[in-house]
Design a protein with these regions (language model features):
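Short proline/glycine-enriched turn/loop segments at secondary-structure junctions
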Residues: 46, 120-124
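Outer-membrane beta-barrel "beta-signal"
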Residues: 125-139
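Surface-exposed coil/turn segments at beta-strand junctions on protein surfaces, enriched
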Residues: 80, 93, 124-126
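Detector for outer-membrane/organellar transmembrane beta-barrel domains
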Residues: 1-81, 85
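Residues on the lipid-exposed face of transmembrane beta-strands in outer-membrane beta-barrel proteins
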Residues: 36-42, 89-93, 102-104, 133-137
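Short beta-strand segments enriched in hydrophobic/aromatic residues
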Residues: 2-4, 44, 59, 95, ...
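C-terminal beta-signal and adjacent terminal beta-strands/loops
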Residues: 97, 104-117
């Protein structure tokens, strides 16, 4: 997905002031971003119940503004985020009304120094790992 000012889509995006006129009015420019995700799911029948294997991958990148930002900027996420990706494999075992699952999640965000168009360079990665478990009984 390519979008402008797509913070409502949970993308690294927003808008900023690109011109300030003598009468106090302001012109705004949108931040551009690109992102997407991919999810594969496979269900495997067992003698008792079944396994569901899932693999999720997502990516989003800040492409900056088409014009220089000369005033305040309003955006989703930190103003120095360049890109973010997430990988989350999971497995779910279901037997009759009971399900138990586990998901491993690795999320990496590249932070750096924004230029006047809020394109970010000189990045360094920060990674977070999570393990999530689930137990469910349907009745």
């Amino acid at each position: 997905t390519y979008a402008q000012n797509a913070s409502h889509l949970s993308m690294i995006s927003g808008y900023g002031v690109t011109e300030i006129y003598d009468n106090g009015e302001q012109k705004y420019g949108a931040l551009n971003s690109i992102g997407g995700w991919f999810d594969i799911t496979k269900k495997e029948q067992l003698k008792k119940g079944y396994l569901t294997w899932c693999w999720f991958w997502g990516y989003t990148k800040n492409l900056g503004c088409n014009d220089d930002i000369v005033g305040p900027i309003y955006m989703r996420g930190e103003k120095n985020m360049d890109r973010m990706w997430r990988v989350a494999p999971s497995v779910l075992y279901t037997h009759n009304a009971m399900s138990i699952g586990i998901e491993l999640d690795a999320t990496t965000v590249a932070y750096g120094t924004p230029d006047s168009r809020y394109k970010v360079s000189d990045t360094h990665n920060v990674t977070n790992f999570r393990i999530c478990t689930m137990l469910k009984y349907n009745f």
